[in-house]
Amino acid sequence: MSLVRSLALLALLAAPCPAGGLRIAVSFPAERSAAALDGRVLVILSKEAEGEPRFQVRDGPTGQQVFGVDVDGLAPGDEAVIDATTFGYPRASLADVPAGEYRVQALLHRYETFHRGDGHVVKMPMDRGEGQQWNRAPGNLLSTPRAVRVDPARDATLRVELDREIPPIPPPADTKYIKHVRIQSERLTAFWGRPMHLGAVVLLPEGFDEHPDARYPLVVNHGHFPATFGGFREEPPDPDLAPDDSARFRLEGYNRIQQQEAHDFYRRWTGPDFPRMVICKIQHANPFYDDSYAVNSENVGPYGDAIHHELIPALEERFRCLGEGWARFTYGGSTGGWEALAVQVHYPDMFNGCFAACPDPIDFRAYCLVDLYADENAYWLDGAWKRVARPGHRDWLGQVDSTLRDMNHLELVLGTKGRSGQQFDIWEAVYSPCGADGYPERIWDKRTGVIDRDVAAYWRENHDLVHIMRRDWATLGPKLAGKIHLYCGDMDNYYLNNAVYLAEEFLETTTAPHYAGVVEYGDRAEHCWNGAHELPNAISRLRYHTLYVDRMMARIAATAPADADLTSWRY
């Protein structure tokens, strides 16, 4: 349909608005759902000429305008209305959107009702195989993007119909080396009041079938939701692959580099000299995020115990692992970096070492650029005569393109009560006490940034990893000595290096025993730097699965008990 015809059609749909100003009314037909639906209606206005607006929402300078409103029991044909009072991002109000031509798309992120085991009843978006992504979740309703002319000053109603539904995602197939596992968790099912599952993507060693008597070390790779085992490619790189450049790494044909690295990993993994082991990536997407942070939480549930006492034993039995702490390791970056350290701290006897790269804040005195225990406001550094916005994201030269206020306001548009599925909301869901309404208590006011001291105190005692290690070193220290390995770039895009500095300060003071681990920094390295000083970040981030193997083998050699099986898996 041409732009002129699209605008003409929308002009016919426009109707006078008695309240004054522009309104955007979103509905769905009975063909899409005969039942009333709960969820979050999002409306995106995009200046981009191509692509779907739902994939153009972000907090940086290239992000497009989005508005959101909760709906409870929205019936077919009824309308969810966006008007000048609806909170939006980057412009806070529809009245502030410049008049002009846009492409509009609406989406309903569907919620279901959970009758939780703690007695609370909450409405949340259940993961449906996509890893808790509102713009890709199967079953979500959305409209076909179309051109509109927006004039906030005009008394009119722009009507948008949700005429499409995101289809189911087909499950990935198993291969000789990669297996996909799914179990129902008793603990999580009891907490959420409905069947809840944990999954894993398992990479088997070369010779697994040919050596039925072998028992293997288990290595847990933590990180964001893995649909399958990425970075492992049996086939050589595609010679006809069109090059896709990386703006972040300033590299041409980065997709070709990724394929080559994935194939190189396959060749090394199956080669004669690589230690045989099992690597698993955990699938623990949940109603809050694509990942649970692998610890027990008042809001997200007992994921720590479910993973370590249900999933890992099931994997070790099925895939013939050694099943002892000296033969388990964990590693990851960013979210996975925090998890690697957290599970080593909370389950110290279960792992023989953690390798935590660019971890999410491990000391809440440096929660990005916020000291949760001393600062009054997360968004602003206030002085007598001025206030300065706290940066949220920078590049390797320190140029800021987003503030903490930007990031959190976008989250508030995408979902109220911690339901955005984004970064600050999951931290809050994992670390906070449960509120009276069943949703996480806010660490700060999402609109203003004012910090809640009582919530911060709860965070400190339960999830501030450096504080917990300092508080409990007399009992934790003997179990952690030699196991902690931390890596971070000193120009981390999210300022995560600041918390690592504080962790290092504490760890270097430890005695009885000394922590005897590693803390290293990458010069001018951005997010995802993982300890490979000789490689650029663009390459080292593709080599996580092999980077720490030699150190793991050294730990096994130094710490395995006298009767340990050190031979069946070395073939």
Q: What are these language model-derived features?
A:
Residues 6-15:
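Bacterial N-terminal signal peptides
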Residues 1-3:
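N-terminal secretory signal peptides that target proteins for export/translocation
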